[in-house]
């Protein structure tokens, strides 16, 4: 969180709320105040989770007295903070304690005027005890295609799987990943996630920190000693989190992305991991692998102001984010 704030905190204000019971911390609300300008259309002062919109999962930290903590946080924001007009808490796992309690409050506490919406679907793979068991769970067609494409790739090239530890540094491995990710999106005439220098610098910083903690897991499929596909993942408590991928479009006929995914699953099973979380958004390349999916919730509240109500309506109606960006939305630095 501190890493994200270092790169994206400019123009925002922290609203970290702490609940104590007899002096002991029982809950933390990692929030911030962001002020957005929509050119001549209006301005919006929004309470949101630190890390939004980049974080795939957000949550309150609730150690004890969960209901009392949440009510304390919301009451404080409503009664004691007058500098915001819109609350948007994104990407809360539906099956988390925060998600359960917020759903109950949305249903029962009408005076709060909280509203929940289903924000995104998050696919994941339940990992079995053996690679053979996992392969049996795939469709016959997918198993056949994986075998055929790997055989063809090995026939045409010298193939090797590597991790970031095979590079001279974490930075070198990450820059190779950035290039593959961007190359894929440029082939579709789109920008890609790492077109922003700010976003690249953040992930370089985060990868260094995660590497030191033993959480970083960055995979590469090498073809004739050149990177053809890459996957940027994290490991934590017997779970793998798959953040982003990239591949060289020249190797698209070989399905190098799927071949690397198969290698990652095999590595997870051999290491005894229990789940491979494919994270936010159910895209086709994830759906082919997922054994199930979870939902992320979003909780909203309009506090005041006509523009806040208009913004709430527009975003609920499913107006594309790209269209909203055309209004010239920017983060106020004042």
Predicted regions span which residues?
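Residues at the C-termini of beta-strands that transition into short coil/loop
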Residues: 64, 127, 165, 300-303
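Short intrinsically disordered coil segments
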Residues: 77, 136-144, 313-318
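A short, structure-level motif marking secondary-structure boundaries and short turns
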Residues: 134-135, 191-192, 248-251, 266-268, ...
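A general structural signal for short secondary-structure boundary/capping elements
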Residues: 225, 267, 278, 321-329
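A conserved beta-strand-loop-helix scaffold within acyl/acetyltransferase catalytic domains
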Residues: 1-48, 90-253
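A short acidic, often aromatic-flanked loop/helix-cap motif at beta-alpha or helix-coil junctions
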Residues: 68, 167-171, 306-307
């Amino acid at each position: 969180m501190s890493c994200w704030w270092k790169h994206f905190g400019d123009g925002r204000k922290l609203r970290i709320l702490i609940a104590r019971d007899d002096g002991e911390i029982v809950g933390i609300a990692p929030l911030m105040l962001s002020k957005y300008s929509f050119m001549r259309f209006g301005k919006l002062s929004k309470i949101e989770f630190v890390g939004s919109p980049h974080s795939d999962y957000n949550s309150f930290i609730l150690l004890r007295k969960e209901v009392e903590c949440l009510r304390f946080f919301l009451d404080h924001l409503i009664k004691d903070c007058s500098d915001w007009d819109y609350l948007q808490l994104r990407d809360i796992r539906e099956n988390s304690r925060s998600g359960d309690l917020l759903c109950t409050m949305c249903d029962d506490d009408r005076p709060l005027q909280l509203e929940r919406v289903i924000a995104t679907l998050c696919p994941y793979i339940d990992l079995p005890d053996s690679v053979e068991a996992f392969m049996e769970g795939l469709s016959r067609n997918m198993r056949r295609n994986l075998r055929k494409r790997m055989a063809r790739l090995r026939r045409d090239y010298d193939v090797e799987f590597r991790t970031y530890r095979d590079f001279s540094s974490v930075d070198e491995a990450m820059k190779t990943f950035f290039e593959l990710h961007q190359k894929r999106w440029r082939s579709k005439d789109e920008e890609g996630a790492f077109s922003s220098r700010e976003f690249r610098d953040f992930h370089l910083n985060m990868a260094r920190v995660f590497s030191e903690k033993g959480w970083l897991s960055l995979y590469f499929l090498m073809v004739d000693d050149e990177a053809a596909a890459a996957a940027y993942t994290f490991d934590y408590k017997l779970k793998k989190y798959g953040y982003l991928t990239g591949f060289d479009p020249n190797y698209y006929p070989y399905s190098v992305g799927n071949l690397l995914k198969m290698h990652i699953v095999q590595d997870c099973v051999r290491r005894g991991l229990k789940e491979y979380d494919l994270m936010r958004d159910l895209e086709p390349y994830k759906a082919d692998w997922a054994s199930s999916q979870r939902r992320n919730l979003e909780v909203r509240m309009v506090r005041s102001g006509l523009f806040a109500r208009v913004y709430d309506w527009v975003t609920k109606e499913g107006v594309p984010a790209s269209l909203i960006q055309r209004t010239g939305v920017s983060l106020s630095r004042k």
